[in-house]
Each structure stands twice: as C-alpha cells, then as structure tokens.
C-alpha cells in the first residue's frame, strides 16, 4: 500500500476544467501541493489563483511526450518529488455508428485518451520505483466496461485500452513495488462540459438526468488515493451495473 505523505505533491493533467479542476480544488482544500497541466493556459492560471497553497502551473499538451517529460521535470524542480500523478486529460467523440468511425477518429481517441496516459505512466513510474512508493491514477470511464452508448464507441474503445494498460502495469508492479498504488477511476456521467467539447459535439453532460456533480466525483477520487479499491467506481451502483452487463453477455 502506498504511504500517505503529508502534504502530498500531486500532478493533475487536464486540470483546466471538469473532473481535473474538481480534483485540484478538492486536494487544495486538503493541503496538497499541486502541479496543474493542460493546454488552456488562461483557465489553468485562473484556477491556480483561486486555490490556496503551493501550485505550479505547467501549460502542456500531454499527447506530446516531450511535454509530459517537461511536466515531470517542473514538478521535481519545484517540489523535489511527485507523490501522486493523475492522468485525467482526455476527450470524447460522437459518431452515429461504429460503422461511421474513421481511421482519423480512432487515432484521435487513442492519442488523446490512451497514449497521453501511457506517456504519464512512463515518465512518473520510474520516479516512483526509485522512491519505492507513489500513486498513479488513470481516469477512465464506465463506458470502457459497459459500452452501451454506441455514439461513443471510439471513445469507449480508447478507454478500454487504457484499462488494459493500467491493469497490466498493476500486475507488473504488485510483486516488485508493492508500495506503488495503481488506481483506475471509472466515472459515469459527470456534470461537466465533456459532451460539448467532444469531437462531433454531443449532449451537454450537465443536462443528463442523474449526472454526478463534479465535487462529489472529486471527493471520491481524493478519498481513494491512498486506500480502498484499486478499481474506483464513482457511482455507488457501478460494480453492480458492470456485473449485470457481464451476466447479460454471458447469458446467465
């Protein structure tokens, strides 16, 4: 189990809005030192100014490996270590059918949702290994386990690939580095601008009945950094819904 440092140094990608900004606000309130990164610098700086405590702003494109290296280097230069790295950056896409997904669509989803997180894993895990501890958090989606929203098929597939990378790394580290915690977060619909920002547009997530508040999701993630399940469903009915889906597919 990862050691809970006080206060932790936390890197958050995709921190300019949505779940990433919510996590930053929640952890700042708990006294964490933060490194916030996203492409939208004005939004990042506005968020940083609203937070208390030590905050480093690093505008970057996490689909570019050199940028991710730079985020890690800035974190180490400012704070001397990284305790938690949250791969939250990502984007959706809306297409009417699986058959309508183009090569470019799939490549964009893998770039934004899978490869960007892989870069984060590759740059921070060696640091965790050298220190003998750390927490890696990859934010996925319930759609990666229950791909019922077919208009999000390419998005769901890219997040399913992220799940596989996360679980493979977890297996790889559990015997050699038991104090490195690898957490997979599986949110449902969250009241953010995710739908509006999707390639091809989409329904406004904030108008979907039952959408979780960002603050609730951020609190659940913050509570689960250092203890609790490694597959972290932000909806209380998440595991039951996944199990029901598997049973349906299996015909049992």
Go through the PLM ranges and name each one.
Residues 30-47:
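Conserved glycine-rich Rossmann-like NAD(P)H-binding loop of the short-chain dehydrogenase/reductase
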Residues 96-98, 105-107:
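Substrate-binding pocket helix/loop in short-chain dehydrogenase/reductase
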Residues 184, 200-244:
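C-terminal helical subdomain
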Residues 121, 158:
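Active-site helix of classical SDR
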Residues 16-17:
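Conserved glycine-rich cofactor-binding loop
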Residues 141:
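Residue(s) in the substrate-gating loop at a strand-loop-helix junction
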Residues 60-70, 103:
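The beta1-alpha1 cofactor-binding region of Rossmann-like NAD(H)/NADP(H)-dependent oxidoreductases
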């Amino acid at each position: 189990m990862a050691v809970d440092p006080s206060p932790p140094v936390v890197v958050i990608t995709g921190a300019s809005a949505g779940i990433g900004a919510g996590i930053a606000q929640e952890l700042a309130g708990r006294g964490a030192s933060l490194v916030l990164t996203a492409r939208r610098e004005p939004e990042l700086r506005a968020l940083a100014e609203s937070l208390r405590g030590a905050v480093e702003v690093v505008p970057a494109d996490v689909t570019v490996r050199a940028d991710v290296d730079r985020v890690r280097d800035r974190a180490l230069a400012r704070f001397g270590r990284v305790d938690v790295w949250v791969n939250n950056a990502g984007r959706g896409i809306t297409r009417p059918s699986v058959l309508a997904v183009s090569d470019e669509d799939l490549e964009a989803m893998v770039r934004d949702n899978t490869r960007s997180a892989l870069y984060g894993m590759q740059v921070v895990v060696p640091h965790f290994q050298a220190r003998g501890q750390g927490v890696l958090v990859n934010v996925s989606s319930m759609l990666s386990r229950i791909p019922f929203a077919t208009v999000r098929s390419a998005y769901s597939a890219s997040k399913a690939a992220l799940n596989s990378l996360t679980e493979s790394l977890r297996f790889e580290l559990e015997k050699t580095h038991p104090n490195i915690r690898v957490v997979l977060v599986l949110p449902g619909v969250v009241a953010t601008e995710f739908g509006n920002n999707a390639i091809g547009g989409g329904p406004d997530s904030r108008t979907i009945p039952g959408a979780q508040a960002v603050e609730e999701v951020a609190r659940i993630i913050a509570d689960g950094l250092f203890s609790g399940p490694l597959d972290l469903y932000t909806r209380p009915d998440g595991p039951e819904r996944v199990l029901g889906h598997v049973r349906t597919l299996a015909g049992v």
